[in-house]
UniProtKB/Swiss-Prot annotation:
Molecular function as annotated in GO: enzyme regulator activity; metal ion binding; mRNA 5'-diphosphatase activity; nucleotide binding; phosphodiesterase decapping endonuclease activity; RNA binding
Encoding gene, per UniProt annotation: RAI1
Protein residues bound to substrate: 212, 234, 258
Signal peptide: none
Gene Ontology terms: cellular component: Las1 complex; RNA polymerase II termination complex
Organism annotation: Vanderwaltozyma polyspora (strain ATCC 22028 / DSM 70294 / BCRC 21397 / CBS 2163 / NBRC 10782 / NRRL Y-8283 / UCD 57-17)
The protein, known as: Decapping nuclease RAI1
Amino acid sequence: MAVTSNLFVKQKGNTTSLKQPKEISFYSRTPEDEFNVKDDSRLRYYYLPDAELDMNLDLCGGIKKFKDHYKNFQDPGTLKGLLKTIQAYEEIKQKKVKVDIITFRGVIRKLISSAFDSPKFNQVNLRIVLFDGQIFMKEVPRKEEEPKDGKIAPPVYSGYKFENLVTVSKPIPYTSRTTIEKRPKKIVSNGDEYISVVRTGVGNCKLMLGAEVDAIFDFKEEDKDNLKHYVELKTTNAVLTPSDARKFEQKIFKTWIQCFLVGIPRIIYGFRDNNFILKSVEEFSTDEVPLLLKSNSPQLGNSCVDAIKWYGVFTEWLLNQIPRDDPSIKKAYKLVYENNHLRLTEITEEEGEFNELINGETVLTNEFKEWRNSLKVPK
């Protein structure tokens, strides 16, 4: 019989101790769905002169020519690139990374958000594999409903367009003026990703997270931890009324969760009017967001501390529910958010999913499993 455990999302915890995030490596994902370890060719560099804000930049310009590569990805949330990068790191060290949970930042953000959003707006449907004494978590691919006219929604497109308008593919000294000036006319696409691989932790739980990085704010240091140089880019409606302000506070709270998880220190928001014209740009320090929220909305300010405590609660719960003492044990689980709780259910051998999760490549690649098994062979 399947073992099930529930965790009430309003359960209170006391853990507020966070480990300093540290970047151990990085990789790129191409529009052709290829993964390249230690490749920063997809990394962007932030550059927006003040004068360009007077140009009435259109965040919906070129929407009809948008190239959507994501729809061709077999599995947008695959761990393949993350596992390749961890394996390359372990091959140098000749030992496995000492962490409890390996997943993407987006997965942990969703789990944190379950304490603040309903399942309707924050769907959590994960598959977990216990392998080699570690917990690997992956999101189940969700078939997005395509717009009837096949076009991307303007608010979604405006985010991609903003990134195109405020970044370049090389550091500024190596970028021509022509390239910079042609940014408004450049065709927008998705699928190019630069992912940082970060070791972090909360309480007694150590995590390895993959996190897509929007851009470098200033400069990149070779062979060093570059977390302090990264920036998160977002767009939203201009804040004109108290109602707008409340909506923005909710948005920046979610962005803060994204950034504090992996130690990204800066957030830049582009504010657009109702016609999707970029009106202003504002920079926020990730560390100062809780103070900003507390001064404007005390309840939301407290949510930042509550988010960290809840992060500690659900990771501790997972570690307690999933036995990790014997590295030879392999198990599979599903983790979902429904009503007011997270539900963890063990997937038994009789279920169709079990074989694919344990012996197939739904979560772990055969290459990674073979690598880990080779580490156990006495040299």
